[in-house]
């Protein structure tokens, strides 16, 4: 056997010895951990503060304590529970058909975090779905005032009292009030044609009245030209 083979064998033996020494914890530390495990055998899941306290008592790191409890719950805890006449499957982490309350208690706050985080995507989806008709509804509303603006365009030109009554009647019978309650913003085409013809009559009457006022101011001796105004205003009735 060569010197290189002897060196390799010695290296393997030294590694094996280190692994064995690394896995063995001090007896006093193990006794403290065993006592804590027995006192909390029905809920053998130490909290973060308890881990720090055990770390100070045993002079071990928190990681070593976590690893020790993981192994102890699988190897030591079932025997402790059987001595008490309990079913280990109801208290250990290896159970599969246990109660939901037993699963939630050892994990601390992790189940509550899951319960809060799961509904979050559904809320986002519900908000995105509900926001679509809201935006579409807001986009449809500005289309309604256009027919109303067309009807009110000759309003500043009104000077006689008879034409003012005609415009107020036209506004009272306009279909724009019902458009805000119905989803489709398109009014009937027949109403548009009726109001367009009525609008032409109003404009002609206003233009005729203005011409008569000018003629009356230029030549006051023509009172007969002012008589046709009431006839024009009564035609739409």
UniProtKB/Swiss-Prot annotation:
Tissues showing expression: Widely expressed. Highly expressed in heart, kidney and testis. Weakly expressed in brain and prostate.
Gene3D superfamilies: Homeodomain-like
SMART domains for the chain: HOX
GO cellular component terms attached to this protein's record: centrosome; chromatin; nucleoplasm; nucleus
Domain of life: Eukaryota
Region (Repressive function): 103-237
Positions of post-translational Phosphothreonine modification: 182, 186
Subcellular location: Nucleus
Segments for region (Disordered): 87-106, 172-193, 213-237
GO MF entries: DNA-binding transcription factor activity; DNA-binding transcription factor activity, RNA polymerase II-specific; DNA-binding transcription repressor activity, RNA polymerase II-specific; sequence-specific double-stranded DNA binding
Keywords from the UniProt entry: DNA-binding, Homeobox, Nucleus, Phosphoprotein, Transcription, Transcription regulation
DNA-binding region extent: 16-79
Post-translational modification note: The C-terminal part is phosphorylated in response to EGF signaling by the Ras/MAPK pathway.
Family under the similarity heading: Belongs to the TALE/TGIF homeobox family.
Any further remark recorded for this protein: TGIF2 is amplified and overexpressed in several ovarian cancer cell lines.
Task of the protein: Transcriptional repressor, which probably repress transcription by binding directly the 5'-CTGTCAA-3' DNA sequence or by interacting with TGF-beta activated SMAD proteins. Probably represses transcription via the recruitment of histone deacetylase proteins.
Subunit note: Interacts with the transcriptional modulator SMAD3 and the histone deacetylase HDAC1.
Name of protein: Homeobox protein TGIF2
Species per Swiss-Prot/TrEMBL record: Homo sapiens (Human)
């Amino acid at each position: 056997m060569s010197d290189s083979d002897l060196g390799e064998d010695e290296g393997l033996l030294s590694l094996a010895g280190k692994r064995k020494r690394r896995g063995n914890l001090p007896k006093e530390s193990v006794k403290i951990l065993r006592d804590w495990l027995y006192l909390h055998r029905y809920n053998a899941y130490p909290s973060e503060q308890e881990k720090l306290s055990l770390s100070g008592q045993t002079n071990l790191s928190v990681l070593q304590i976590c690893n020790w409890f993981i192994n102890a719950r699988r190897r030591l805890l079932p025997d402790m529970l059987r001595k008490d006449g309990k079913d280990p499957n109801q208290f250990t982490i290896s159970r599969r058909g246990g109660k939901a309350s037993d699963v939630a208690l050892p994990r601390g706050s992790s189940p509550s975090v899951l319960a809060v985080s799961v509904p979050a995507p559904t809320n986002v989806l519900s908000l995105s779905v509900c926001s679509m008709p809201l935006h579409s509804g807001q986009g449809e509303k500005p289309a309604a005032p256009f027919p109303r603006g067309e009807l009110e365009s000759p309003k500043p030109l009104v000077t006689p009292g008879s034409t003012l009554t005609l415009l107020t009647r036209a506004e009272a019978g306009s279909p724009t009030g019902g458009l805000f309650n119905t989803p489709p913003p398109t009014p009937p085409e027949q109403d548009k044609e009726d109001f367009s013809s009525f609008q032409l009559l109003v404009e002609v009457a206003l233009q005729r009245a203005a011409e008569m006022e000018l003629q009356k101011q230029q030549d006051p001796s023509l009172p007969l030209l002012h008589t046709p105004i009431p006839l024009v205003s009564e035609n739409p009735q």
